[in-house]
Swiss-Prot record:
InterPro entries: NADH_UbQ/plastoQ_OxRdtase_su3 (IPR000440), NDAH_ubi_oxred_su3_sf (IPR038430). The chain crosses the membrane at residues 5-25, 57-77, 86-106. Core subunit of the mitochondrial membrane respiratory chain NADH dehydrogenase (Complex I) that is believed to belong to the minimal assembly required for catalysis. Complex I functions in the transfer of electrons from NADH to the respiratory chain. The immediate electron acceptor for the enzyme is believed to be ubiquinone. It is a multi-pass membrane protein. Its main location: mitochondrion. GO terms for cellular component: mitochondrial membrane; NADH dehydrogenase complex. The lineage of its organism: Eukaryota, Metazoa, Spiralia, Lophotrochozoa, Annelida. Pfam families: Oxidored_q4. This is NADH-ubiquinone oxidoreductase chain 3. It is found in: Mitochondrion membrane. It comes from the Eukaryota. It catalyses: a ubiquinone + NADH + 5 H(+)(in) = a ubiquinol + NAD(+) + 4 H(+)(out).
Amino acid sequence: MILTALSSAIALLVPIIILGAAWVLASRSTEDREKSSPFECGFDPKSTARIPFSTRFFLLAIIFIVFDIEIVLLMPLPTILHTSDVFTTVTTSVLFLMILLIGLIHEWKEGSLDWSS
């Protein structure tokens, strides 16, 4: 009981201390024109520092990450099948795969997976 309370207290205090230190250290830097401008050998920059980014590519990357995380969640499934109730595990897995399939069909119908347009 005491060990659990001590672990919980440490788990709460360490992030608070780190965030506090980051806040104190970050407040020391002051914003001015020279610090926020890109450095090009002392001359004024030739173009903006911002590069245009394709929102189509960004959306496709986010979809990939979401489906990749869902696949990673399916990885322990064979181990779970051997250790727990088979009916519950299969039912949960089929429900999870159906939600995945519905999401994929929605993205397909929406046109998010079409790279050419």
